[in-house]
Swiss-Prot record:
Pfam families: BrkDBD (PF09607), DDE_1 (PF03184), HTH_Tnp_Tc5 (PF03221), KRAB (PF01352). This is Pogo transposable element with KRAB domain. It comes from the Eukaryota. It comes from Mus musculus. Residues 589-599 have a biased composition (Basic and acidic residues). The gene is Pogk. One of its GO terms (molecular function) is DNA binding. Residues 250-323 form the HTH CENPB-type domain. Keywords: Coiled coil, Developmental protein, DNA-binding, Isopeptide bond, Nucleus, Ubl conjugation.
Length: 607
């Protein structure tokens, strides 16, 4: 008689130091031996059921006594219960299910095994062994969980599957035990991977949390196809989810920095300054961090208190930058009329005198503070507007008369100090320094600027006419200033009131980068340390010579290309033949007489 094999699960095979084991297909014997995975040294190693089973032939089984057969049945049950108690993803093979239910040997029309079919009249080598008694028909193993608890999305084209048989539901690598579909059939329908991770956005998580709060965690997990552990975790971080963007999927990043103690002490410093009402800047936080690091003997190469560190530290402690809302300049109601009038006056002068590009300029005075007050402060996220104190020296300033030409050149800065005399000291070259009691531009200083700066500009020729654009400040349009400009063969153009932000080149392209550069140099000077302190504990203001050097560096950093683009943007140096560049010109309506803003002196015929 031909030998028959019956599986007996005695132990699990352990594979050492193998990350992958190639699974071979069985050609003979029971085909329902399903693939399992066991854990060996932290890695998942696949094995076959027949590799952990023992086989008996009919002759060998008949030799055994009833006590031996009962012993093997008990060993089988103990081994299987042990595997389930260890929570191994071990499915109950179809063979064991049929043995426990005391199924008859298949002699019906057709019996389908995995990959083998026995027809009605075909003799089968397989029959139910004697050791599978009816007492094993009732199983006490845990029932499998439904698909929803695993977050599976079954394709719609697969027909409805029958109910689960007893056994642990292991679907990742071997298919679905108890189903008519084999593992290969299931693998061809959808792709499963044990290492697959799914991510959910904050909007979805909030929806699950709200459903869980109205019902319970289990119902929410089943309803949305997620794990119950995820529901518990999401309920713990509900405030963060509500404050986050709806499409945010993760809250990654270290919760503590490399130097957690430094971060903690800087955060305490920020709270202390907030309680006093003093403004806190990121530069001040960096300076404080360097001071703390020096006290803790942290090497400078290991901790530099960079701007990136400051941003990450603020993110860890829920701090943000609060910006001062600037007051916008309200444009005049008759904006269009003033723009057209100004453009027509400039075009009339240019067509009358045909200025060289290097002879068209723009000049204006601007205040530059010695101690630039910060427009931002560090505060808690979501706080209402707050009031902060200032050092009290933001009004200590100087006045700088700046000038630029349409070809991109910059005129020497004309500095006006506040006081009755120029203090002694070493000042940078390339600038003119004057003083005034209040630090303002006056009529006399304006005439002095025309003599020492405008008349001495590079390329100025006595008989070559020029054009200078100024704002409506009262000292610009006095009779003495107009007379001096006429003697210099220069036409004056006054920008209409309220439109300097749109028509003055210095406002458009110069002032912002200039002030930003001065602020950056002042911040670097603060971070350098070794500051002299006042009796109240505040840092003293920088020396005058150093501050003037910062202004000179910032002035030299303004590129010529940006100045040229600024003149074109304000439609001062636009090509007269290119009508597309003349924004406000009205064809055939050029005024025969200059408008009031220009004055009759500004259109005098050239020699």
């Amino acid at each position: 008689m031909e030998s028959r094999a019956y599986p007996l699960n005695l132990t699990l095979k352990e594979e050492q130091k193998e990350e992958e084991v190639e699974i071979q297909e069985l050609e003979d014997g029971p085909i329902d031996m399903q693939k399992v995975q066991i854990c060996s040294e932290g890695a998942w190693v696949p094995a076959l059921f027949d590799e952990v089973a023992i086989y008996f032939s009919d002759e060998e089984w008949e030799v055994l006594t009833e006590q031996q057969k009962a012993l093997y049945r008990e060993v089988m049950r103990m081994n299987y219960e042990t595997v389930l108690s260890l929570e191994f993803p071990f499915p109950k093979p179809d063979m064991i299910n049929r043995l426990e239910r005391d199924e008859e040997c298949p002699n019906s029309d057709e019996w389908r095994l995995q990959g083998v079919t026995f027809a009605e009249n075909e003799e089968s080598d397989f029959r139910t062994p004697d050791w599978a008694s009816p007492t094993n028909a009732t199983s006490h193993f845990p029932q499998p969980q439904p698909f929803n608890s695993f977050g599976l999305r079954l394709p719609q084209d697969i027909t409805e599957l029958p109910e689960w048989t007893e056994g642990y539901p292991f679907y990742m690598a071997m298919g679905f035990p108890g189903y008519d579909l084999s593992a290969d059939d299931l693998a061809s329908k959808f792709q499963f991977s044990r290492g697959m991770r799914r991510s959910y956005d904050a909007g979805f998580k909030l929806m699950v949390v709200e459903y869980a709060e109205s019902t319970n965690n289990c119902q929410a997990a089943k309803q949305f196809g997620v794990l119950e552990k995820n529901v518990r975790d999401w309920r713990k971080v509900k405030p963060q989810l509500q404050n986050a963007h709806a499409m945010r999927r993760a809250f990654r990043g270290p919760k503590n920095g490399r130097f957690a103690l430094v971060d903690q002490r800087v955060a305490e410093y920020v709270r202390y300054m907030q309680a006093k009402g003093d403004p806190i800047t990121r530069e001040a936080m960096q300076l404080k961090a360097l001071e703390i690091a020096q006290e803790m003997n942290i090497p400078e190469k290991g901790f530099k208190a960079s701007l990136g560190w400051c941003r990450r530290m603020m993110r860890r402690y829920d701090l943000s930058l609060r910006h001062k809302v600037p007051v916008p300049q309200h444009l005049a109601e008759d904006l269009t009329e003033k723009l057209v009038t100004y453009q027509q006056s400039v075009l009339a002068l240019r067509r009358t005198h045909d200025y060289e590009v290097a002879q068209m300029g723009n000049a204006d005075e601007t205040p530059i503070c010695l101690e630039v007050p910060s427009r931002v402060t560090v505060d808690n996220q979501g706080e209402k507007p707050i009031l902060v104190k200032t050092p009290g020296r933001e009004k200590l300033r100087i006045t700088a008369m700046l000038g630029v030409l349409a070809d991109g050149r910059k005129l020497p800065p004309y500095i006006i100090l506040r006081g009755t005399y120029i203090p002694p000291g070493k000042f940078p070259s390339g600038m003119e320094i004057r003083c005034h009691r209040y630090g303002w531009m006056t009529e006399d200083l304006m005439q002095d600027w025309l003599e020492v700066v405008w008349r001495r500009r590079t390329g100025a020729v006595p008989r070559q006419r020029g054009m200078l654009i100024l704002n409506g400040f009262r000292c610009h349009a006095t009779d003495s200033v107009k007379s001096s400009m006429e003697n210099m063969n220069t036409d004056m153009v006054i920008i209409p009131g309220g439109l300097t932000s749109q028509l003055q080149v210095l406002d458009v392209v110069v002032y912002k980068p200039l002030n930003d550069s001065v602020r950056a140099q002042y911040s670097n000077w603060l971070l350098a340390g070794n500051l002299a302190l006042s009796p109240t504990g505040n840092a003293k203001k920088p020396p005058l010579g150093l501050f003037l050097e910062w202004i000179m560096v910032a002035w030299n950093s303004i590129s010529s290309e940006s100045i040229v683009q600024g003149f074109r943007k304000c439609h001062i140096s636009s090509n007269l033949e290119d009508e597309g560049d003349v924004l406000w010109e009205i064809e055939g309506e050029l005024p025969k007489e200059p408008p009031k803003e220009c004055g009759p002196e500004s259109v005098a015929e050239g020699d």
